[in-house]
UniProtKB/Swiss-Prot annotation:
Lineage: Bacteria, Pseudomonadati, Pseudomonadota, Betaproteobacteria, Neisseriales
Role according to the record: Allows the formation of correctly charged Gln-tRNA(Gln) through the transamidation of misacylated Glu-tRNA(Gln) in organisms which lack glutaminyl-tRNA synthetase. The reaction takes place in the presence of glutamine and ATP through an activated gamma-phospho-Glu-tRNA(Gln).
Keywords tagged on the record: ATP-binding, Ligase, Nucleotide-binding, Protein biosynthesis
Catalytically driven reaction(s): L-glutamyl-tRNA(Gln) + L-glutamine + ATP + H2O = L-glutaminyl-tRNA(Gln) + L-glutamate + ADP + phosphate + H(+)
GO BP terms: translation
Similarity field: Belongs to the amidase family. GatA subfamily.
Organism: Neisseria meningitidis serogroup B (strain ATCC BAA-335 / MC58)
Location of the active site: K76 (charge relay system), S151 (charge relay system), S175 (acyl-ester intermediate)
Domain of life, per lineage: Bacteria
Protein known as: Glutamyl-tRNA(Gln) amidotransferase subunit A
Gene: gatA
């Protein structure tokens, strides 16, 4: 019962072939069996889950259900929900029970979706491996010795392991797409401002965006329909007409212009990644898509620009954690200043401290122009590159990550880890939508994904192209033993 896609589960629930309680119970049993090794979930509450499932069954019986009523979903530990712990995988918020619910979570609750739990992540969404979690690293279900990616690694792992039909993630510099690639699932980061950020713990406010993660592009489109929309509680939310993100699912690939950035297909990519790209190129050609070489020359500048800007925003956003109103507080201190210092030293992990220090430095007097202002100018150049490319093509095909998932504990420096996000970060700098879908496997049997990037508000086109690729391939249907 836990092998269904979101769409399949929806059909079975609406036709009353299964009940929401039966489906939720099956997932809870699978979680109890597999999660101790996987560590994909860090918070489970069976009573709350089954109560939501019973309410969903009542709604279905009364005939006022939506297509998502009774379908289970997992939430990254970054989303607040009344009565649930929302720790952001940090000691700092280990005991924080949220008094309110994030808008995107409320949207799915209004549809009647059933909460399975909170998934593991890199602390405060800072990381690419899920090793920066206070609760220990999540594992890759394809090989438990490898990382699932990050920062939404737990969400990717539980969907791949069939411990949830879908999950929510957040994407600041690739945190939905990179773990989706490493775990062999589909995940989309929408255009910045499409999905409300209210109730999602902030890391870098001008980058953060919520998106769905599931087995298929069709599942992601169905979820995004429920997630997206204007929210007056979020000052960065975009006021646009409601869209149907499933509208292009049946559009053929014939005639679609796909850009291939010449800078993305060279050195630095493993043979496995190049093979996955070629698999996708061959499929696109066979279906009649037109392939065009484009250039994104400023991509190499995206890493330094991102880590200056995101760290600066993080240092500001995380200044609220001081042990006064909520979160961890040091047990012993002589005065207020010592309480602040000890609380933050004890509550934050090493990667979070590193980024706070970088951010504080680049915003400090005398360095603002040299670092922060220059990085903002680079951000503009990266965005301009994409607009030049989209003048010639509809979508861009790119790698998601230069390699398959590395081993847990791999001896990589912070800079080497940052460089692994080279293909995802540019998209966040520009605020564009992008989706990762499975496209092959490494020699070691680990999934490898590729990325489809679109212009602003091209989510339906991206999802349609991805769905057509998945109708003509079976990478997305593979699952770990």
């Amino acid at each position: 019962m836990t092998q269904y896609t979101l769409k399949q589960a929806s059909v079975l629930l609406q036709s009353k072939q299964i009940s929401a309680v039966e489906l939720a119970s099956a997932y809870l049993a699978a979680i109890a069996e597999k999660n101790p090794a996987l560590n994909g979930y860090i918070t489970i509450d069976q009573d709350k889950t089954l109560a939501e499932a019973r309410a969903a069954d009542e709604r279905i019986a009364q005939g006022n259900a939506s297509a998502l009523t009774g379908v289970p979903v997992a939430y990254k530990d970054i989303f607040c929900q009344t009565g649930w712990r929302s720790a952001c995988a940090s000691k700092m918020l280990d005991n924080f029970i949220s008094p309110y619910t994030a808008t995107v979570v409320q949207n799915l609750l209004d549809e009647g979706m059933v909460t399975l739990g909170r998934t593991n992540m890199d602390e405060f969404a800072m990381g690419s491996t899920n090793e920066n979690s206070f609760y220990g690293a999540a594992k890759n279900p394809w090989n438990l010795e490898h990382v699932p990616g990050g920062s939404s690694g737990g969400s990717a792992a539980v969907v791949a392991a069939r411990l949830a039909p879908a999950a929510l993630g957040s994407d600041t510099g690739g945190s939905i797409r990179q773990p989706a690639s490493h775990c062999g699932i589909t995940g989309i980061k929408p255009t910045y401002g499409t999905v409300s950020r209210f109730g999602m713990v902030a890391y870098a406010s001008s980058f953060d965006q919520t998106g769905p993660m599931a087995q298929t592009a069709e599942d992601c489109a169905i979820l995004l329909n429920a997630m997206a929309g204007f929210d007056p509680k979020d000052s960065t939310s975009l006021e646009r007409e409601k869209e149907d993100y499933t509208r292009d699912l049946n559009q053929p690939l014939k005639g679609l212009k796909i850009g291939l950035p010449k800078e993305y297909f060279g050195e630095g990519n493993s043979a496995d990644v190049l093979t996955a790209l070629q698999n996708t190129i061959d499929l696109l050609k066979a279906q009649g898509a037109e392939l065009i070489e484009v250039s994104l020359p400023q991509t190499k500048l995206s890493i330094p620009a991102y880590y200056v800007l995101a760290s600066a925003e993080a240092s500001t956003n995380l200044s609220r954690y001081d042990g006064v109103r909520y979160g961890h507080r040091a047990a012993q201190f002589a005065d207020l200043e010592e309480m602040y210092g000890k609380t933050r030293a004890e509550g934050f992990g090493s990667e979070v401290k590193r980024r706070i220090m970088i951010g504080t430095y680049v915003l400090s007097h005398g360095y603002y122009d040299a670092y922060y202002l220059k990085a903002q100018k680079l951000r503009r150049l990266v965005a301009d590159d994409f607009q030049t490319a989209f003048a010639r093509c509809d979508l861009i095909l790119a790698p998601t990550a230069p390699t398959a998932a590395p081993k847990i504990g791999a001896d990589a420096s912070p800079v080497e880890t940052y460089l692994s996000d080279i293909y995802t970060i540019a998209v966040n700098l520009a605020g564009l939508p992008a989706l990762t879908l499975p496209a092959g496997f490494s020699g070691g049997g680990l999934p490898v994904g590729v990325q489809l990037v679109g212009n602003y508000f091209a989510e339906a086109k991206i999802l349609g192209a991805a769905h057509q690729i998945q109708l003509n391939s079976d990478w997305h249907g593979k699952r770990p033993e």
